[in-house]
């Protein structure tokens, strides 16, 4: 038990350091830290034998056993995965061993193990999402337009301008038309990928997401889906779209944002930040909520609701330099020019967010 306890504590410390210093995720850091403290408290409560005094490191037969070479650690994801697995195995060993001495404690070790499973998924997901969405600070929500030709012109013009993330969102489309528009957008994006395969990432096709209709996203092979806080739970959405596609989640308060992280979302949409011309809200999000999310959570986070070019500065001041927009682009006389202006401003803001709490203008 002493060896397993040491192994678990060491593994948790490595995971904590990785999410703290590499991912810079305050929320996950707090979760791992609390888990580590809960393990220490449980071990202290369950110290039926003075395990420190019974320790015999020099006489441990396992100390001289040579195992196969450890899996290489090439990325932060490798580091987190290896040490989370080490911690989970150690907690399982503790759970089984304590059944011989004090069975009443077994379920508590099991609870710690399942908490680590959830943290591992969230941390690895955060690292993957950060890589997938690196350099993407604008998501444009596109409607179905009046006909297929108008839709194709819109999508092509946005991609040509440099937009790399679009979300198909049109509550007025029937299922058949939504499927047709999604196929169009995917074909345009994939063709552009092929044409610009040897060029910089900024010249390549966009990530194509589907709003709400996770079934359409999965069936057509879209890059992901975005769901609201009142839609299917995140864990069920993940079952539908699979592990490889991006899963976005809207959060209206800190609790929803934290839950989305631990449930496996890849990115967040937070707000509404301002009154919107495309969707009605009971109230706008408080600046304190937006600032807390920007400060605590490392998942790519997009400000939503009433975003305009003139409002980007106030969002950057509270730490949000990614935005999702609809009418600011699609409702403009020249959508491509509107998108280009947003991209230019966001590029200048991305390095100087302050996380200050103040009013939004």
Where are these regions (language model features)?
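Glycine/Thr-rich beta-alpha phosphate-binding loop at enzyme active sites
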Residues: 172, 177, 220-227, 248-295, ...
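Acidic (Asp/Glu)-rich catalytic clusters
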Residues: 155-161, 187, 191, 201, ...
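Alpha-helix-loop-beta-strand connector modules within alpha/beta enzyme cores
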Residues: 179-196, 201-212, 229-252, 281-309, ...
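Catalytic cores of alpha/beta
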Residues: 208-223, 252-266, 296-303, 307-325, ...
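Glycine-rich phosphate-binding active-site loops on the catalytic face of alpha/beta enzymes
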Residues: 164, 169-171, 229-236, 269-281, ...
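Structural preference for solvent-exposed beta-strand-turn elements
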Residues: 1-130
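Active-site beta-loop-alpha junctions enriched in small/polar residues
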Residues: 141-145, 171, 213-215, 230, ...
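Active-site mouth loops of central-metabolism enzymes
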Residues: 76, 134-152, 245-251, 303
């Amino acid at each position: 038990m002493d060896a397993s306890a040491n192994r678990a504590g060491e593994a948790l410390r490595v995971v904590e350091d990785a999410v703290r210093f590499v991912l810079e995720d305050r929320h996950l850091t707090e979760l791992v830290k609390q888990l580590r403290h809960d393990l220490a408290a449980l071990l202290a409560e369950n110290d039926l034998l003075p395990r420190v005094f019974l320790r015999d490191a020099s006489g441990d037969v396992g100390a001289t056993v040579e195992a196969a070479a450890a899996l290489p650690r090439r990325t932060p994801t490798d580091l987190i995965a290896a040490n989370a697995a080490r911690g989970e195995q150690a907690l399982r060993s503790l759970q089984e061993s304590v059944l011989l001495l004090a069975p009443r404690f077994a379920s508590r070790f099991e609870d710690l193990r399942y908490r680590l499973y959830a943290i591992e998924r969230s941390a690895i997901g955060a690292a993957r999402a950060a890589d997938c969405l690196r350099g993407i600070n604008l998501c444009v929500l596109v409607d179905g337009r009046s006909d297929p030709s108008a839709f194709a012109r819109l999508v092509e013009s946005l991609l040509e301008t440099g937009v790399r993330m679009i979300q198909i969102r049109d509550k007025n489309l029937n299922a058949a038309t939504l499927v047709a528009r999604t196929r169009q957008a995917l074909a345009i994006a994939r063709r552009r990928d092929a044409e610009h395969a040897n060029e910089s990432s900024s010249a390549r096709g966009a990530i194509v997401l589907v709003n709400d209709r996770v079934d359409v996203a999965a069936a057509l092979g879209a890059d992901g889906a975005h769901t609201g806080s009142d839609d299917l739970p995140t864990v069920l959405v993940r079952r539908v779209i699979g592990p490889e596609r991006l899963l976005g989640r809207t959060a209206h308060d800190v609790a929803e944002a934290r839950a989305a992280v631990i449930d496996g979302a890849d990115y967040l949409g937070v707000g509404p930040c301002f009154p919107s011309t495309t969707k009605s809200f009971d109230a706008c999000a408080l600046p304190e909520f937006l600032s807390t999310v920007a400060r605590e959570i490392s998942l790519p986070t997009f400000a939503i609701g009433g975003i305009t070019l003139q409002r980007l500065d106030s969002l950057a001041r509270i730490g949000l330099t990614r935005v999702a927009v609809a009418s600011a682009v699609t409702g403009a006389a020249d959508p491509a020019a509107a998108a280009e202006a947003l991209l230019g401003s966001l590029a200048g803001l991305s390095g100087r967010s302050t996380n200050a709490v103040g009013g939004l203008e």
